[in-house]
Amino acid sequence: MIYQGESIRVDFIEPGFAELQFDAKGSVNKFDQATLEEFSEALTKLQNTDDLRGVIVTSSKSTFIVGADITEFLTLFSDQEKTRSWVAKASRVFDQLEDLPVPTVGAVTGFALGGGCEALLACDYRVADTTATIGLPEVKLGLIPGFGGTMRLPRVIGPDNALEWITTGKNNKALDALKVGAVDAVVEPENLTKAALNLAKAAAAGQQDWKAKRQPKLEPLKANDTELMMTLVTAKGMIAAKAGKHYPAPHKALEAIENGAREHREGALTAENNAFFDLTQTEACQAQVGIFLADQAVKGKSKKYAKAATKEIKTAGVLGAGIMGGGIAYQSALKGVPAVMKDIKQDALDLGMKEAGKILKKGVERGKVNNEKMIKILSSITPTLLNDAVKDVDIVVEAVVENPKVKGSVLAEIEGVIGDDAILTSNTSTISITELAKNLKRPEKFCGMHFFNPVHKMPLVEIIRGEKTSDDTVNAVVAYALKLGKTPIVVNDCPGFLVNRVLFPYLAGFAGMVDEGVDFVGIDKVMEKQFGWPMGPAYLSDVVGIDTADHCTVVMEAGFPTRMKRDESSAIAKLAAAERYGQKNGKGFYVYGTDKKGKPTKEADPATYELLGCEQGKKLDADEVIARCMIPMVNEVVRCLEEDIVGSAAEADMALLYGLGFPPFRGGPFRYLETLGMDNFIQLADKYAHLGEIYQVTDGMREMAKAGKSYFDTTSAK
């Protein structure tokens, strides 16, 4: 044995040829700080090993290396000096691999991402098996490769290909990597180690010039000035169009490659180190790393629920066809759970099947679904007018009109049809699950299952626990949501649950400005272009449906009569009364139509200004617009955490990211609060407290700020 550590071992695989194998104790290999130390120690041992002729780098697991240990990042990045030292030292460990006095071959199976890909790039040769996926996804964390990726990849596959890989963060299958020269061969999994060893032997025997293969990675980039300039200019345009100003990582990746292009290895690595460090101190990086960690926490919690499930969902029933019902039935059938779609009208059933067919047709056009699979999925949806058709299903998702009396009646009726062990759920967006359960004989078998529209695209499903909902029911429904490919987040019952409860104070803040005569178009521009929402509040209201939003204000007022009191003179109420329902009937805040080419159009309507009494072009300072929209949202999500509606700040952040499209570079409402600083937020909110209760922070937040605590410390949020 040449070296034995906790995560790495090195030994001769046969005389003269050593295998450096990653074998972490966990389920995957990753470069945490301890593993990087071991990597350096192992390479030092190899450097000093006599009679060494070649080295292959492998993994004992079904995947190679998934990258750095992201759980260490936020703590590490909070110390600037430590961060600078860490990235400089860590990147030089990969130089040790590249500088070994013998040929090196990386053997990749499964995922080789981030640092895993960078370890491969430090090898002279790379062999992948057919399961391999290789990539540098750091931009998705607001970062760039930090272990030499921006220096080595352009020298291996060319600057144009490297820029595409690095600035998009895309994963690449083995054969695609082979086409651009990122790997030298692709073999079947059972032949991987043998192929890597044979290549090392061939290089050691002089049949391959491994020194010539290594040399370009040590020198300035081999591209003439004109070629390089054209590549960089093209990349700058693409990055500006795709990443925009809110995501600095792709811009920094380009900067690192440009600054290092004419440098030898050390100079190019220094350029990368500097760019990497700069990004670690940005709000976007803190937010995007926070999202990753929150997503992992949410997934881990969901898996625990699902693991505890005693009932497996094999068949589903959907009550109410239409757009939502059709979408739910489609998603269930797509993921292998046959669905019975029941409605009282044939027209609605036809619409539901049409919705499923429309989604599948787009999949066929894009090459994601073949005709055979399309037919199979559609045949897994059974449209019916008969209640008895759902009597044997394992779960029913009610998706009828958002009316408590109608829902209550439908749920009670279907409960009498399904088996005693079947689970009943409601796809309500605001109505109390506890109240709906009062009509049921088995309330413990009932919960909310709130999908978001369009169902096939939106990842979030809120699982709402009523007062009498059993743990077994929640566990089974979470497992079903996971089977559907969704991200379930369990919340406790209250009007609006989590997402809509938090949304309506935000819309109320917006409406307050419109009531003062401020141009809604200007507000939308600020919230989209500067804050980063995919849609401003006026446009969002039109997409949700003005009538739907207006109806929800009635429900929210019933639950929170002072804080969310409905105002008949508000913009939403006025538009609803004028039957301007938004996109669904072509007119809301905006008017909707199509241009000569059939593309959808959205324009401000003079009639809207007249109806609402607001003035075209009247603006507020952008900071005030953001404050008046966002303070109510943050205050409400804090209340939800303090009242135990949602279990953690991480879950709340992910719910708003996945359910509302909260700007990822801001990380969610709690990460946004953390970035602003709680003291600063309180000071800002107090400035607007005279506008109403939605602007007034909780006593709990004041206590948290005084104690210097964070809502990400879950023990402090209860």
UniProtKB/Swiss-Prot annotation:
Reaction(s) this enzyme catalyzes, per UniProt: a (3S)-3-hydroxyacyl-CoA + NAD(+) = a 3-oxoacyl-CoA + NADH + H(+); a (3S)-3-hydroxyacyl-CoA = a (2E)-enoyl-CoA + H2O; a 4-saturated-(3S)-3-hydroxyacyl-CoA = a (3E)-enoyl-CoA + H2O; (3S)-3-hydroxybutanoyl-CoA = (3R)-3-hydroxybutanoyl-CoA
Q: Which domain of life is it from?
A: Bacteria
Keywords per UniProt: Fatty acid metabolism, Isomerase, Lipid degradation, Lipid metabolism, Lyase, Multifunctional enzyme, NAD, Oxidoreductase
Q: Where does NAD(+) bind?
A: M324, D343, V400, V401, E402, K407, S429, N453
Q: Where is this region: Enoyl-CoA hydratase/isomerase?
A: 1-188
A GO cellular component annotation here is: fatty acid beta-oxidation multienzyme complex
Q: Where is this site: Important for catalytic activity?
A: E118, E138
Where on this chain does substrate bind?
A: D295, N500, Y658
Q: Does the keyword Lyase apply?
A: yes
The cross-references to Pfam families, in alphabetical order and at most eight, read:
3HCDH, 3HCDH_N, ECH_1
Q: Which GO terms fall under biological process for this protein?
A: fatty acid beta-oxidation
GO terms (molecular function) for this protein are: 3-hydroxybutyryl-CoA epimerase activity; delta(3)-delta(2)-enoyl-CoA isomerase activity; enoyl-CoA hydratase activity; long-chain-3-hydroxyacyl-CoA dehydrogenase activity; NAD+ binding
- Describe, as the record does, how this protein assembles with itself and its partners: Heterotetramer of two alpha chains (FadB) and two beta chains (FadA).
| Family according to the record | In the N-terminal section; belongs to the enoyl-CoA hydratase/isomerase family. In the C-terminal section; belongs to the 3-hydroxyacyl-CoA dehydrogenase family.
Function recorded in the entry: Involved in the aerobic and anaerobic degradation of long-chain fatty acids via beta-oxidation cycle. Catalyzes the formation of 3-oxoacyl-CoA from enoyl-CoA via L-3-hydroxyacyl-CoA. It can also use D-3-hydroxyacyl-CoA and cis-3-enoyl-CoA as substrate.
What is the designated name of this protein? Fatty acid oxidation complex subunit alpha
Species for this entry = Idiomarina loihiensis (strain ATCC BAA-735 / DSM 15497 / L2-TR)
Report which gene this protein is encoded by: fadB
